[in-house]
Each structure stands twice: as C-alpha cells, then as structure tokens.
C-alpha cells in the first residue's frame, strides 16, 4: 500500500486590495462564514461549518488571470442563482448559454476574478 500523497489542497486564496469587501461578496455567494482573521483585514478565511469548503482573502496586488472558479447548481435553481449573483453585484461577461452538458453563465466578481455558474443535466 502506498503512502498518501504528501501535498493536500487547503483553500483557494484571492489576492485583493479590499479583503473585507471581497470576502463579504463570496460569503453571500457561497454561504460561508468567517473562520479566521489576522492583522486586522490583511488575511481573512471563510469556511463552511465543517471547515471543508474554504476561501482565503489576502491583502495584496490584484492579479486576475486565466484561472476561474466553477460554481454548480441544479438546472431548476439556475435562473434564481443567476439573479442572486447579479444582485450581489457580480458582472455577467457573456450571455447565458445552453450547452450539451447544461447551462452556463460567466461572471466576474468585484475584483474582476472570473467564475462560472454551471447547471448540469
């Protein structure tokens, strides 16, 4: 039997000049609560009540790039979740598309980080 892989995934971290603003946005999007905070607002971590889903926000230079998050919901929740994201001030970057696998909407958050809302068949 082999040893477990020594590296494990911990959290996704956003570099942002506005940790509290971006953490509040993602808290509403994902239903996560603040679980860690260091040096005022330099470092904030959100997590679910089991500590499994975690997002980090560290004060730093904002560098949106080619990486994005895929958020998944059911097809019957897709329209309502899309409206909720827009109400939270996410910006839709392309029209909603129907694909072979289901529906997709492309967004950026308040700092310009890309994420998709997907609903699979």
Regions found by a protein language model. Give the residues of each.
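Short beta->alpha junction loops/turns
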Residues: 19, 74, 97-100
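Eukaryotic phosphotyrosine signaling hubs
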Residues: 9, 64-69
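Short hydrophobic/aromatic beta-strand micro-patches
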Residues: 13-15, 70-74
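Vicinal oxygen chelate
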Residues: 2-7, 11-14, 35-38, 45-49, ...
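Conserved active-site tyrosine of GNAT-family acetyltransferases
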Residues: 22, 26-27, 85, 112
């Amino acid at each position: 039997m082999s040893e477990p892989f020594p590296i494990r995934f911990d959290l996704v971290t956003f570099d942002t000049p506005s940790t509290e603003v971006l953490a509040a946005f993602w808290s509403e999007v994902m239903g996560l609560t603040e679980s860690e905070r260091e040096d005022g607002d330099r470092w904030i971590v959100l997590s679910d009540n089991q500590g499994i889903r975690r997002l980090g926000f560290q004060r730093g230079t904002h560098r949106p790039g080619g990486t994005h998050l895929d958020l998944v919901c059911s097809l019957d929740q897709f329209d309502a979740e899309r409206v909720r994201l827009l109400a939270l001030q996410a910006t839709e970057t392309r029209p909603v598309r129907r694909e072979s696998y289901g529906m997709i909407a492309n967004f950026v958050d308040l700092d310009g980080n890309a994420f998709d809302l997907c609903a699979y068949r």
